[in-house]
Regions:
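Short hydrophobic beta-strand element within catalytic cores of glycosyltransferases
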Residues: 45-48
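A short hydrophobic beta-strand element within the catalytic core of glycosyltransferases
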Residues: 23-24
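Short alpha-helical segment that forms part of, or immediately flanks, the ligand-binding pocket
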Residues: 14, 37-41, 55
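Aromatic "clamp/platform" in nucleotide-sugar-dependent glycosyltransferases that forms part
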Residues: 27-28
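Short acidic/histidine- and often glycine-rich active-site loop of Leloir-type glycosyltransferases
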Residues: 50-66
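Nucleotide-activated donor-binding/catalytic signature segment of Leloir-type glycosyltransferases, i.e.
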Residues: 1-7
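Short alpha-helical donor nucleotide-sugar binding micro-motif in glycosyltransferases
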Residues: 14-20
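A charged, aromatic-enriched C-terminal amphipathic alpha-helix characteristic of glycosyltransferases
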Residues: 70-141
Length: 143
């Protein structure tokens, strides 16, 4: 188990991440969840709290009860549950790999790719162009 308590360069971070089987988050503030996703890309399974963006992005099998890490005191109370969950996940790593691949694809498609956003913007542009052309046609017919 590695806790990052020192500054790493991006290269050092990615090398360490490439050796990991799990990426654990106890974040109480997170907007995108990039660290667990980076881990998933190199085959590390995520274990994230059921809060923040993680609630929407991750299935239950990758989440733990968010109350377990809302504070150091709550972590101390729930430490055994969390340790048991980590042990269970690590022992079942090989069995979880197919689900990890599914998760990687889901996150890539839904949250870490511009394809959906670009398609949506493009469809709005097409709709706008169609409406503009229709208005122009009506104006030219009345003139």
């Amino acid at each position: 188990v590695v806790c990052q308590d020192k500054q790493l360069t991006k290269d050092e971070y990615h090398k360490l991440l490439g050796k990991a089987k799990m990426v654990f988050s106890a974040n109480t503030q997170e907007t995108l969840g990039i660290s667990p996703y980076e881990g998933i890309l190199v085959g590390a399974m995520p274990l994230v709290p059921d809060r923040l963006s993680y609630t929407e992005m991750y299935d239950d099998m990758w989440k733990y009860d968010s109350r377990w890490t809302t504070s150091y005191a709550s972590y101390q109370i729930n430490k055994e549950k969390l340790v048991n969950m980590i042990k269970d996940d690590m022992q079942n790593y090989d069995n979880k790999l197919p689900k990890l691949e599914e998760l990687k694809q889901k996150l890539t498609d839904m949250y870490f790719s511009a394809t959906n956003l670009l398609n949506t913007i493009h469809s709005y542009g097409e709709k706008e162009n169609k409406e503009t052309k229709e208005k122009s046609r009506k104006i030219s017919l009345t003139v």
